[in-house]
């Protein structure tokens, strides 16, 4: 028996758990981030949105909090609901993607500027030393990017 077959034999009983690990991590993270914004509207977030000139900051901040809790719960519950849960999981994954794109745009847009500038400017010297740029490190290693891509995974895959 080669090592690959041996590892397959060990992992086989746990293969059904793999998506649940991702589902529970993403769902719990979103639920906790959303609950942390209660009671509604979240005052600190409203003040921050006002400072950025966002229209109806109380409504937007409340929708973000409710969206986080709802998407997190739907990611988890969608896996338990069989075929009807497939659609719920995909919609929740899409909601996670939308929320995370908004979070990255509003709170972390400087990461993109740092990350993309060398490519846009065509500065080969800077491109070869990207790891020295703070935005590059945040962009690649951030929790936000992992949450975004986990949401994308569930939006594409659903319960399949």
Identify the residue ranges that each predicted region occupies:
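Extended, low-polarity transmembrane helix blocks
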Residues: 1-40, 58-160
